[in-house]
Amino acid sequence: MNQKIVEQFQKKHESLVGIVHLVSGMSEAAEEAVSILQEKEAEKVAMSELPEEFRHILEQKCAENGMELLKPPFHNADLPQAFDSVQAGISWAAFAIAETGAIVEFTTDDSLRLVTALPLVHICILRASDLISTLKEAASPIRNFFKDNSLNANVSFISGPSRTADIEMRLILGVHGPAETHAIIVN
């Protein structure tokens, strides 16, 4: 792990009103995620596709704390009703960019994007080794993702909470998406 890149990402992401948590392993990442969920009194949580080692720990910890966990695959007909009552979404980043503070997520299923876009709280997990320095470095993995998934590729750049300033020219967070975003970086 390059500590300088982690610090640069943290500083930039926090300047965008994102919250960064540094942890040392998957178990600690799941504990941190559940701690955030408890703080937000989340009872219903949606998750996107997550690595098996993290997903298993998260499922166990959510069950221990009485939280309902919606897991993919999602059935499109049920999505609007299901996401109406979800308080938080948990996703996995392909990588993040230290220079911009943006988290980058790849999906090939439109419904998985809802996990990051609809709940009031979004928690994203990423490995410290998946941090890159510059936006220019993002071009190659994005190009490869589109090449490998030409029919239905989605790339999302997530730079903190949703924001708008079209109401009386005042910045308001969380109007069109999450009001709070957390990036949990696993060393």
Q: Where do the protein language model's features map onto the residues?
A:
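The feature marks the mature, well-folded catalytic cores of soluble enzymes
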Residues: 1-187
